Regions:
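N-terminal signal-anchor transmembrane alpha helix
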Residues: 1-42
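Hydrophobic residues within alpha-helical transmembrane segments
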Residues: 10-13, 63, 95-99, 118, ...
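Transmembrane helix-loop junctions in multipass membrane proteins, especially transporters and channels
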Residues: 23, 27-31, 84-85, 113, ...
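A loop-to-helix transmembrane entry motif
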Residues: 54-67
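Core segments of transmembrane alpha-helices
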Residues: 64-77
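Juxtamembrane boundary at the C-terminal end of a transmembrane helix
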Residues: 87, 129-136
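Interfacial loop-to-transmembrane junctions
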Residues: 100-125
Length: 136
């Protein structure tokens, strides 16, 4: 397995960890009666994520943000893998992406401004660098 595919697998596991963190925080915040309900707007009045306190809501947003970033990172890994273009540079970019995504969660949770945005930017640059390195 290439380093990029290894990092992709680890990024998917990170998504699972983020899901667990967000789920536990949401259940502690809102209670099982709401989180295990059918979540009908007419019954609850608004979506569950809008009812969350600040910190659980941040975990929710970080979780969703990783879905968005993971889509592009997956594209980058597929491009590198199918082109058989894995290099030390693309491998380093993949690890940088994962490090940035790991750092992003506490940065978002603790509201670290401007660090959260800078961490996101590092991961995004690493992702696009993988694609560009494969194309040139």
């Amino acid at each position: 397995m290439t380093p990029e595919l290894t990092v992709l697998a680890l990024a998917a596991l990170l998504q699972g960890v983020q899901f667990a963190l967000m789920s536990v925080a949401a259940n502690l915040d809102l209670g099982m009666a709401k989180t295990a309900s059918p979540r009908d707007i007419d019954r609850l009045g608004r979506p569950l994520h809008e009812m969350l306190a600040t910190k659980p809501a941040r975990l929710y947003r970080a979780f969703n943000n990783h879905f968005e970033a993971l889509i592009l990172f997956t594209v980058a890994v597929v491009v590198v893998s199918l082109a058989d273009a894995s290099t030390p540079f693309t491998a380093t970019c993949a690890w940088v992406y994962l490090g940035a995504r790991i750092a992003y969660v506490p940065a978002y949770y603790f509201g670290l401004v401007p660090w959260r945005s800078l961490i996101f930017f590092v991961g995004a640059v690493a992702t696009f660098a993988m694609i560009l390195a494969t194309l040139i």
